[in-house]
Amino acid sequence: MAPKVALFLALSLLFAATAHGCEPNCSGPVVPTPPVVPTPSSHSHGRCPIDALKLKVCAKVLGLVKVGLPQYEQCCPLLEGLVDLDAALCLCTAIKANVLGIHLNVPLSLNFILNNCGRICPEDFTCPN
C-alpha cells in the first residue's frame, strides 16, 4: 500500500510541476491596446471638414426617406474620423442649410442622428447661428 501512495504523491508532484512550470514557453498576459481616439481636427476652425451636401443621406436616419441601403450604412460612414463635436457641427450645418430637404427641430434631429451613429452630442453644444 505504501508504494502506491508514494507513486501517487510522486505523480501528483510531477503533474503539478509540469502544469506550473511552462516558464520558457509561456506567453505573458494579453494587454489590450487602448482604443484609438481621433484628435480634434485643427483645420476646421468652426467649419465642417466634409461637404454638407453629402449629409443629405442622413435624412434616412430620421426615417423620412426609405430607399436603397439601410439608413445608417450611408450616413454614419460620413461621420467616421470626426470627433463628436465636429460631427455635431457638420450635422448642424446640414440641418440649418436645409440640405436634408426638410424643416427639422435642430436639437432633437441632431441628437437622434448622432445617437444612431454611436456618437454623443456634447452636453453644452448648441448649433452656431
From Swiss-Prot:
CDD domains: HPS_like. Pfam families: Hydrophob_seed. InterPro entries: Bifun_inhib/LTP/seed_sf, Bifunc_inhib/LTP/seed_store, Hydrophob_seed_dom, Plant_LTP/defense-related. Cortical ground meristem of developing roots. Glycans are attached at residue 25. The keyword Manganese does not apply. Residues 1-19 form the signal peptide. Residues 29-40 are annotated as: 2 X 6 AA tandem repeats of P-V-V-P-T-P. Sequence repeats lie at residues 29-34, 35-40. It comes from the Eukaryota. Keywords: Glycoprotein, Repeat, Signal. To carrot DC2.15 and PEMB3. Delineates a novel subset of developing cortical cells. It is probably involved in some aspect of transport of molecules to or from the vasculature. This is Cortical cell-delineating protein. It comes from Zea mays. The lineage of its organism: Eukaryota, Viridiplantae, Streptophyta, Embryophyta, Tracheophyta.
